[in-house]
Amino acid sequence: MVLIKEYRVCMPLTVEEYKIGQLYMIARHSLEQSEEGEGVEVVENKPCEDPVHGKGQYTEKHIHLSSRLPYWIQAICPRVFYVIEKSWNYYPYTLTEYTCSFIPKLNVLIKTKYEDNNGSTENCLDLTEDELKVRTVDHLDIAFDEVSAKHYKKEEDPKFFKSEKTNRGPLIEGWRETDKPIMCSYKVVHASFEVWGLQTKVEDFIQRGIREILLLGHRQAFAWVDEWHGMTLEDVRAYERQKQAETNEKIHNTSGGANAAANAKEANDGDID
């Protein structure tokens, strides 16, 4: 059975504001989290169009993360290991898929929709009756849910952060019921790993990892609001291109990174359609 979790993450922003903040946060976060030989490599970033959702942006990334995996996963993975992320951004709706050429049974699908409310829509992404029966909902609080110690920075803690540009924050207990403006990211995550003996363990690991990333990323988007607020879409796309170039250079800055790039290309040529 595919594990289905719906994460609802409220932000003291409007949906239109978050369109800029999200792009800024992802670009900066990817650079900060990347190291020599490991991190998020942007392979493709181009406009796309869908008959239902209209014009959007397609992005493909290779996430090199061998040393960041738990030992029990490293034991079954090759030395050079990467996950393929494909994302179709038709804001305020996005679709993101994660696969791995080495582990064909692994698949993660994330459907996202953004609304100007505090997480009160009960079936925002139009799940079927069968999906609703197995769905669990997790309301993430960017101020009072804790991130791991290795990711915590006081200056990025919404309980202490005060925006000079927007005069928003610090966030107090119950802020999701009282603060305006407010918006919510609704994310439905389908995670499946159909390997007997490891399925439950891997699917739980994936969901925990996604929850941590969502919590950290949304905290940072708010904590960095004074840096991106007022940017146009053209401004943030230019920033995105700059940071993507810096991130790719950082990943491939050593011989190990170069080998990872070569091996990634070889794997991609051989295993991915």
UniProtKB/Swiss-Prot annotation:
Q: State a GO cellular component annotated for this protein.
A: cytoplasm
| Gene3D superfamilies cross-referenced by the UniProt entry | 3.30.530.20
* Record-linked InterPro entries: PI_transfer, PI_transfer_N, START-like_dom_sf
- Pfam families in the cross-refs: IP_trans
Region described as Disordered: 244-273
- GO molecular function of the protein, one example? phosphatidylinositol transfer activity
Q: In its keyword annotation, does this UniProt entry include Transport? A: yes
Keywords attached to this entry: Lipid transport, Lipid-binding, Transport
Quick one: a GO biological-process term for this protein? signal transduction
Its biological purpose: Phosphatidylinositol transfer proteins mediate the monomeric transport of lipids by shielding a lipid from the aqueous environment and binding the lipid in a hydrophobic cavity.
Q: Which family does it belong to?
A: Belongs to the PtdIns transfer protein family. PI transfer class IIB subfamily.
What is the protein's name according to its record? Cytoplasmic phosphatidylinositol transfer protein 1
